[in-house]
């Protein structure tokens, strides 16, 4: 039976006429006032700052006092909305499974790619990888204000203090090694400019691309050659997808529309924008109480029912954006395409490609979804790296360490390797600082962080090479699906996830990195980059070059498949490939793990125990909830699948961690 809904925060906010920051801070375990000392101070309550704090509190409960400082008065808008099974697995380790998460977020069932032919308008190829059966795993499309609010409340329930409306004063802050030597200056709020000083052993830079502390140690590094710019907006989410001009299109995928200059992301997700923060806090708290009580999925209120219960705004939207190379040559005058740069470049590419025009005719622009001036967004020169990610008394996590591109969503999903590993290391850092003289402590901490520094130093170039590999392959409709996507999933599919626990999660994440550090993957990636980059972007790749790269990739693939020590049902996971990862033109069969609600149009996981739409509450029939396995499972496969998702050996965290440093050809 579900708990009784409570309106604690709504009533508290009304009684005290509390601001957003005040009502959020009132939920801290030690209250709203900043502490005099804290083992760890985290700068930034974005997704990685909160993942760090939650992971540290769960890894060794009650061992560290953690204070998270966030300048915004409430969780606010950020781009980065698509997650992978690794993110869901981490959420599940923290007590929140799919039944509860899907009341707040959208379902994601794998990734689909459409490769547009620039020279033959209207023609395309595709690649599709499904997700996983709902009884085992899930993936989510998340609106960031909601994910950050969920993690804020969950962190507070785990003993972490999260202070909104407070800002680290980096000019006055003193960070030094050797134990408890940090003096973190924090503003008290809008109407009190006198900073409060917090004594701490460790400062964590979780300020994302702004790199507020990292930037003091070294300027950001830009990679040679072309970079990428992104421009995007928010659109309606059509219930009827039948008019979309791509075969077998489904809104439950993260859809990628790829072309020689870049690609478009298409992400269908729910938005709670416009809701009062106190009301949202009441709803999230209720969801967490339901999770604690183990309320079955079909006994939970749907998202629409929750919105009515707690007086919230709720709608489905579509995030659509371009991530395009910055060496593209645009017309000198773009005024015919709109009034702002983001709008102009967005519409320029829509009109350049016939299929993009047809596609966008199914969507209507939502103006100012996240407040005035938020109809169009643009971000330039996306890729960078922080040369220094730790030092005496501090370390960096997430995008503060570097970022490459939204393609394959590494920012959240791969970035979790830094935030969770740093969380585990922090316990040892603080222990060393308390148990040894300052100089000896700092020497030990420096040695402890060498592997972390080396990992971050190799991680971002590996992701940059991965990004460039995919981009250059998008220049041909054969290389996109048969080389880039094939290798991304063969090397990077998330194996062993069912065996990961809170102690081994970081080690798993460090080794995964979307397959970008797998030697065979790097071999194919470097070959493609070396060859394709010799051809100007506005020219078509020669057929002889494409044939050579296909043959090279297939040789490496065949050897890797033969040597692979585990079996996956590749013909069921990938739409156009057989079990040995051979491309099969015209093959459309695959497993089916989702269905679309006939009422609201939301995409739902197929599970025998879930007949209710998590979005609108409409009940389905038993046949509608059945998974289709194509090809059918053997008895052994069925037993293994429901036990562990795949037939791989158990994940062994004691395996030697090898971190090869990838090399990238000169631009």
UniProtKB/Swiss-Prot annotation:
User: Active site annotated at which positions?
Assistant: 108
Q: What is its EC number?
A: 1.14.-.-
Ordered alphabetically, the record's keywords are: FAD, Flavoprotein, Monooxygenase, Oxidoreductase, Zinc
Q: Which GO terms describe its molecular function?
A: flavin-dependent halogenase activity; monooxygenase activity
Q: Which residues bind Zn(2+)?
A: 597, 600, 613, 616
Biotechnology annotation for this entry: Malbrancheamides have the ability to inhibit calmodulin, calmodulin-dependent phosphodiesterase (PDE1), and induce both endothelium-independent and endothelium-dependent relaxant effects, suggesting their potential as vasorelaxant agents.
Source organism's superkingdom? Eukaryota
- Oxidoreductase found in the keyword field: yes
Q: Where is this region: Flexible region?
A: 621-646
- Looking at the keywords, is Transmembrane present? no
Residues bound to substrate:
494
Q: What is the effect of changing residue 613 to S?
A: Leads to an insoluble protein
- Give the enzyme class: oxidoreductase
Please tell me where FAD binds in this chain: 48, 70, 79, 82, 144, 168, 399, 412
Q: What is the effect of changing residue 494 to D?
A: Decreases but maintains slight catalytic activity
Q: Which reaction does it catalyse?
A: (+)-premalbrancheamide + 2 FAD + 2 chloride + 4 H(+) = (+)-malbrancheamide + 2 FADH2; (+)-premalbrancheamide + FAD + chloride + 2 H(+) = (+)-malbrancheamide B + FADH2; (+)-premalbrancheamide + FAD + chloride + 2 H(+) = (+)-isomalbrancheamide B + FADH2; (+)-malbrancheamide B + FAD + chloride + 2 H(+) = (+)-malbrancheamide + FADH2
The note describing how and how many cofactors are bound reads: Binds 1 FAD per subunit.
A Gene Ontology biological process noted in the UniProt record is: secondary metabolite biosynthetic process
> What Pfam family is a match, any one?
Trp_halogenase
Q: What does this protein do?
A: Flavin-dependent halogenase; part of the gene cluster that mediates the biosynthesis of malbrancheamide, a dichlorinated fungal indole alkaloid that belongs to a family of natural products containing a characteristic bicyclo[2.2.2]diazaoctane core. The first step of malbrancheamide biosynthesis involves coupling of L-proline and L-tryptophan by malG, a bimodular NRPS, to produce L-Pro-L-Trp aldehyde through reductive offloading.
Concerning its family, UniProt says:
Belongs to the flavin-dependent halogenase family.
Instruction: Tell me the PANTHER family matching this sequence.
Output: FAD-BINDING DOMAIN-CONTAINING PROTEIN, FAD-BINDING PROTEIN
Name of the protein in question: Flavin-dependent halogenase malA
Name of the gene = malA
């Amino acid at each position: 039976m579900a708990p009784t809904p409570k309106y604690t925060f709504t009533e508290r906010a009304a009684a005290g006429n509390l601001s957003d920051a005040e009502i959020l801070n009132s939920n801290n375990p030690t209250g709203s006032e900043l502490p005099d000392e804290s083992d760890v101070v985290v700068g930034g309550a974005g997704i990685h700052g909160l993942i760090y704090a939650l992971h540290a509190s769960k890894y060794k409960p009650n061992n560290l006092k953690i204070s998270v400082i966030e300048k915004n008065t409430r969780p606010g808008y950020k781009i980065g909305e698509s997650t992978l099974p690794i993110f869901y697995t981490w959420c599940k380790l923290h007590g929140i499974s799919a039944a509860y998460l899907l009341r707040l977020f959208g379902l994601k069932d794998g990734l689909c790619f459409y490769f547009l032919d620039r020279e033959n308008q209207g023609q395309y190829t595709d690649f599709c990888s499904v997700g996983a059966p709902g009884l085992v795993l899930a993936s989510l499309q998340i609106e960031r204000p909601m994910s950050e609010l969920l993690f804020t409340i969950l962190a507070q329930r785990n003993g972490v203090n999260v202070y909104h409306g407070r800002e680290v004063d980096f000019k006055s802050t003193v960070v030094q090694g050797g134990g408890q030597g940090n003096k973190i200056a924090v503003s008290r709020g809008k109407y009190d400019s006198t900073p409060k000083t917090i004594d701490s052993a460790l400062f964590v830079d979780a300020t994302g691309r702004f790199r507020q502390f990292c930037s003091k140690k070294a300027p950001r590094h830009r990679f040679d050659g072309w970079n990428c710019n992104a421009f995007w907006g928010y659109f309606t989410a059509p219930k009827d997808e039948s008019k979309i001009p791509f075969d077998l299109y489904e809104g439950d995928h993260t859809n990628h529309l790829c072309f020689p200059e870049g690609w478009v992301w298409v992400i269908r997700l729910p938005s709670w924008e416009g809701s009062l923060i106190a009301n949202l806090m009441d709803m999230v708290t209720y969801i967490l109480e339901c999770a604690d009580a183990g309320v079955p999925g079909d006994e939970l209120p749907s998202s629409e029912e929750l919105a009515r219960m707690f007086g919230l705004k709720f709608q489905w939207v579509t995030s659509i954006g371009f991530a395009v190379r910055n060496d593209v040559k645009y017309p000198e005058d773009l005024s015919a395409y709109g009034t702002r740069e983001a709008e102009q470049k967005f519409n320029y590419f829509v009109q350049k490609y016939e299929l993009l025009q047809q596609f966008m005719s199914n969507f209507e622009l939502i103006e100012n979804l996240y407040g005035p001036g938020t109809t169009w967004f643009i971000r330039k020169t996306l890729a960078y790296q922080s040369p220094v990610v730790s030092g005496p008394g501090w370390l960096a996590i997430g995008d503060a360490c570097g970022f490459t591109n939204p393609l394959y969503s590494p920012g959240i999903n791969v970035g979790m390797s830094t935030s969770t590993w740093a969380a585990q290391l922090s316990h040892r850092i603080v222990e060393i600082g308390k148990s040894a003289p300052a100089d000896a402590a700092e020497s030990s901490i420096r040695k402890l962080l060498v592997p972390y520094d080396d990992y971050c130093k190799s991680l971002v170039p590996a992701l940059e090479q991965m990004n460039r590999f995919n981009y250059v392959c998008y220049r041909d409709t054969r290389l996109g699906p048969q080389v880039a996507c094939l290798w991304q999933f063969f090397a990077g599919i998330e194996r062993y996830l069912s065996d990961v626990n809170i102690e081994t999660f970081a080690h798993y994440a460090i080794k995964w990195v979307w397959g970008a550090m797998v030697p065979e993957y790097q071999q194919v990636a470097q070959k493609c980059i070396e060859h394709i980059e010799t051809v100007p972007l506005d020219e078509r790749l020669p057929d002889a070059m494409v044939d050579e790269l296909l043959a090279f990739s297939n040789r490496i693939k065949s050897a890797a498949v033969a040597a692979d020590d585990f079996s996956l049902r590749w013909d069921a996971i990938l739409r156009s490939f057989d079990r040995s990862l051979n491309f099969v033109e015209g093959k459309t069969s695959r497993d089916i793990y989702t269905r679309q609600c006939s009422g609201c149009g939301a995409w739902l996981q197929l599970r025998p125990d879930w007949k209710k739409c998590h979005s609108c509450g409409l009940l389905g029939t038993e046949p509608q909830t059945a998974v289709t396995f194509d090809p059918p499972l053997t008895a052994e496969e069925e037993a293994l699948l429901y036990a562990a998702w795949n037939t791989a050996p158990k994940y062994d965290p004691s395996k030697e961690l090898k971190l090869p440093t990838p090399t990238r050809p000169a631009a």
